[in-house]
Amino acid sequence: MSKLEALKFILLLGAVYYAIGGIAHYFGLTIFPFFVSELYVPYQDSIIALVCLIFVLLLLAVARDPIKNVDTLNVLILGVALASVFSILIIYKIDLASLGAPAKKLQTITEGIMGFIYLGLLLWLHPRRKI
């Protein structure tokens, strides 16, 4: 598998991840075993689902031709970096235990670490432009 094929696969994998996350948020489903229904807020989770849908569309568009769409790939990389940082910052901003969801801390850490691993893969597989 070439580096470009690997990048396309990783982009498609990201689209699947965000599609599953968007569906879970929109319908109030759980992916992790420690779902806390009190944290489900239809309005906010619908906004998260919309953001996931936008990410899915961008990932799929870039996966078709990452070299041609390198500028959009760069925007996606920045978006993944921001999402990963925000996942970690949530731990410090929100007292999940006081909301009755202490196990959400582990979920949030897991999501942040997965995001940073995904970010690393995108950076490693990035098709550098030759000027």
Per-region residue spans from a language model:
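Hydrophobic alpha-helical membrane segments
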Residues: 51-54, 73-91, 111-118
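Membrane-helix boundary connector in multi-pass membrane proteins
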Residues: 86-107, 126-127
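Cytosolic juxtamembrane helix and N-cap/initiation of the first transmembrane helix
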Residues: 1-17
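Membrane-interface helix-boundary motifs at transmembrane edges
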Residues: 1-4, 63-72, 99-100, 130-131
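Membrane-interfacial loop-to-transmembrane alpha-helix junctions, especially the N-terminal start
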Residues: 7-12, 68-76
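Membrane-water interface at the C-terminal end of transmembrane alpha helices
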Residues: 112-131
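Core segments of alpha-helical transmembrane spans in multipass integral membrane proteins
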Residues: 16-24, 42-63, 78-85
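Non-cytosolic membrane-interface motifs at loop->transmembrane helix junctions
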Residues: 34-43, 98-110
